[in-house]
C-alpha cells in the first residue's frame, strides 16, 4: 500500500477524533507501529538472511534470519509503498489510530492484533482473495 494512502486513511479514520496532525507525528506513529508489529510477527518484507551495509538489524529470528528496521515513510513520494507486507498495512493503520486516540479507543488495537494474528495463522502468506 502506498505511504500516502496509508496517511490519508489514518487521517480519515481519525477525522472525528482529532482535527489535524502534522506528517512528522504520523511518521513517528507509523514507525512505532512497525516496531510493535515486528515484535509480534516476522513480516516477510523485513526478513533478511544477508546483511547489507545500509540495513539496521531490529532483531534476530529463526534459521539465521533477522528483521531489519523499515525505512521511515516518505509522503513526498506518491509512488513509495509502506515498507511492510501488504496484509499488515491495515495493522499499521489501526495501531496508529490507537496511538492517536491516546489509547482510549482500544477497538483499533484489537483490530491491529486480529490482523497480526491472521497474518501469523496464514504463516505470513498473502491470500489472493483476502479482504481486510
Predicted regions and their residues:
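Exposed beta-sheet edge/beta-hairpin loop segments within beta-rich domains
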Residues: 82-87
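Conserved short "hinge" loops at termini or chain/domain junctions
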Residues: 1-81, 111-132
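Charged, low-complexity interaction regions
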Residues: 18, 100-106
Amino acid at each position: 500500500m502506498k505511504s500516502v494512502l496509508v496517511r490519508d486513511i489514518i487521517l480519515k479514520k481519525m477525522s472525528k477524533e482529532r482535527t489535524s496532525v502534522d506528517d512528522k507525528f504520523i511518521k513517528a506513529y507509523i514507525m512505532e507501529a512497525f516496531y510493535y508489529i515486528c515484535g509480534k510477527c516476522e513480516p516477510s518484507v523485513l526478513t533478511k538472511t544477508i546483511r547489507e551495509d545500509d540495513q539496521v538489524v531490529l532483531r534476530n529470528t529463526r534459521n539465521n534470519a533477522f528483521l531489519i528496521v523499515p525505512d521511515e515513510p516518505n509522503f513526498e513520494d506518491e509512488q513509495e509503498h509502506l515498507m511492510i507486507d501488504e496484509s499488515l498495512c491495515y495493522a499499521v493503520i489501526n495501531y496508529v489510530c490507537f496511538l492517536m486516540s491516546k489509547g482510549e479507543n482500544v477497538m483499533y488495537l484489537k483490530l491491529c492484533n486480529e490482523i497480526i494474528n491472521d497474518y501469523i495463522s496464514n504463516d505470513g502468506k498473502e491470500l489472493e482473495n483476502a479482504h481486510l
